[in-house]
């Protein structure tokens, strides 16, 4: 792990020795000039997909942090700085690193940046592994049914996360990825912004209830294939 400061910017890298141009890894233009941008995804902002296997051993996804909701229309990407470790990018990087080391199927964190601004503000970026040959669960469920065993596997995945006492504050069907690996499916969890460790067990049922609401919402909105039987199978996996 490498941490550096350059003027008003702070960087965290998932390697030990400095690399050429590493502070420019957060600029889409830097990657565009090298012809390494392979695609984009649109959310609150643009996620840039990068061809970086030769650099990092994996392809990468570059994301700038943006606010959502009504506040995001007024203040798109400025956050209040309290400490470096509490910034959005550094906190997500640290959590992903912990989960990755624990063997959880989450994107490997590659680098994080915090740019301090005047009046106690900051902006943030993160560079993570791109999960290949994958689509989010809602996209899959629009055209296919999952097997009972697949639902149980998703339940087991969430139980593993909860056993580590990690609360995914935005646990929903869009943040579960389905990856095709040698004719088998592997399930990943995404988007750990604002997530973290939580003691006790009281919150776990609430977290599962949040996930179920997201399935019901997308069943009504997008027509995804989801039944009460599917949910029961997910719970079986979670409980076993």
UniProtKB/Swiss-Prot annotation:
Compartmental location: Cell inner membrane
Membrane topology label: Peripheral membrane protein
Which keywords describe this protein according to UniProt? ATP-binding, Cell inner membrane, Cell membrane, Kinase, Lipopolysaccharide biosynthesis, Membrane, Nucleotide-binding, Transferase
Q: Which GO CC annotations does the UniProt entry carry?
A: plasma membrane
* GO biological processes: lipopolysaccharide core region biosynthetic process
Main localisation:
membrane
Q: What class of enzyme is it?
A: transferase
User: What Enzyme Commission number(s) apply to this enzyme?
Assistant: 2.7.1.166
The name this protein goes by in its record? 3-deoxy-D-manno-octulosonic acid kinase
List the residue ranges forming a coiled coil, or say none.
none
- Which SUPFAM superfamilies is this protein grouped with? Protein kinase-like (PK-like)
Q: Which gene carries the instructions for this protein?
A: kdkA
Q: In its keyword annotation, does this UniProt entry include Membrane? A: yes
Q: Which organism is it from?
A: Actinobacillus succinogenes (strain ATCC 55618 / DSM 22257 / CCUG 43843 / 130Z)
A family per Pfam? Kdo
The family annotation for this protein states: Belongs to the protein kinase superfamily. KdkA/RfaP family.
> HAMAP family given for it?
KDO_kinase (MF_00521)
């Amino acid at each position: 792990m490498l941490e550096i400061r350059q003027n008003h910017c702070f960087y965290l890298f998932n390697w030990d020795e400095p690399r050429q141009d590493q502070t420019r890894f957060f600029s889409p233009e830097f990657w565009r000039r090298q012809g390494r941008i392979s695609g984009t995804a649109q959310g609150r902002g643009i996620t840039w997909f990068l061809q970086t296997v030769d650099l990092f051993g994996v392809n990468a996804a570059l994301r700038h942090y943006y606010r959502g909701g009504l506040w995001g229309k007024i203040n798109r990407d400025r956050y209040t700085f309290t400490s470096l470790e509490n910034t959005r990018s550094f906190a997500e990087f640290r959590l992903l690193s912990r989960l990755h080391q624990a063997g959880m199927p989450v994107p490997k964190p590659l680098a994080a940046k915090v740019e301090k601004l005047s009046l106690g503000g900051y902006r943030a970026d993160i560079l993570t592994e791109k999960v290949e040959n994958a689509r989010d669960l809602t996209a899959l469920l629009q055209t296919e049914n999952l097997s009972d065993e697949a639902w149980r596997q998703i339940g087991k995945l969430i139980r593993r996360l909860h056993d580590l006492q990690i609360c995914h504050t935005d646990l929903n069907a869009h943040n579960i990825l389905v990856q095709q690996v040698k004719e088998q499916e592997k399930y990943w969890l995404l988007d750990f912004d604002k997530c973290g460790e939580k003691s006790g067990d009281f919150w776990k049922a609430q977290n599962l209830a949040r996930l179920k609401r997201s399935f019901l919402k997308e069943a009504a909105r997008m027509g995804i294939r989801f039944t009460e039987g599917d949910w029961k199978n997910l719970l079986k996996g979670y409980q076993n």
